């Protein structure tokens, strides 16, 4: 398959990675003039004391900063009366997109509603901030949003250099390719895309994975890079690119919005691991606990058969594990240990259902996407989704 090598290349400058503000550390030191009055032994002792003081002051400064942050987010969220959640500005059907009434819907959106329900007992106490890929981490680091739930891949650099804590993997995904089957009828594999112009969004893991894949397979390609997903979508739909690459779930979502969706085919290859999940700022352990245990609560509820329809009845169950999860034990305190009420899981499930219900409603059999559970099934059904025990 031959591709037009003269196709225009549009490339935006890669946005510099934002880094969280550093913690200022006071340094203790001795001036050189005073140190000169001592002999070698005294100088060595003074130098050792200097290092100890520096270390103690550094630990104290970092400890004070972490302690100050530890109570901040939950208290701030409660004080303002709502959760601020960062979602996809482009509107990714099934994950985060406004419906016909302007209400945000999707798997990522329902996770935020679950967190709001855990805190307030009301899943509607959440506001959504639409964010592009290049803005999402800065918005979280700066405190513009309390939590980021925006089809974001969990990587080591984001977990460390960007100062994020990922609460879990709400959707196991992988990067794929989509082509116009009518325009390229002979292409049924990504290995046939040598020389192709490929639409890709900047500031994403997708861009790097694309380069790695073509290099590994000794193929040439022309990246057509756009700053926003909206621009990439429009360029591909207009025919400016031979193929489009992003997370495979995203391709199914984007295809629904194309002028002629049925003309386009998602190729079978998955070229990367894309564990997608919500994240919070580092330095606030209590908030991190709430973020990750909300995710685990959704999974445990599905595993135990607790649904949006039966959760009230399940509160009367004699099953010890169900009683513990729903906070109906006489000495229940798991919720209060999190800074929440003991019926926090009841509130979550009443608001959004369990993980399986969220999946099917937004991206599964009950949605236009019709994506199979696959590896996103529970571990008891051959999948990777596994809720840590609530006990």
Name every feature range the model reports, one short phrase each.
Residues 113, 117, 121, 125-192, ...:
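Acidic, polar ligand-binding/catalytic clefts
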Residues 55-64:
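Bacterial N-terminal signal peptides
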Residues 71, 78-149, 333, 340, ...:
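Extracytoplasmic small-molecule ligand-binding "clamshell" domains
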Residues 331-391:
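C-terminal functional modules
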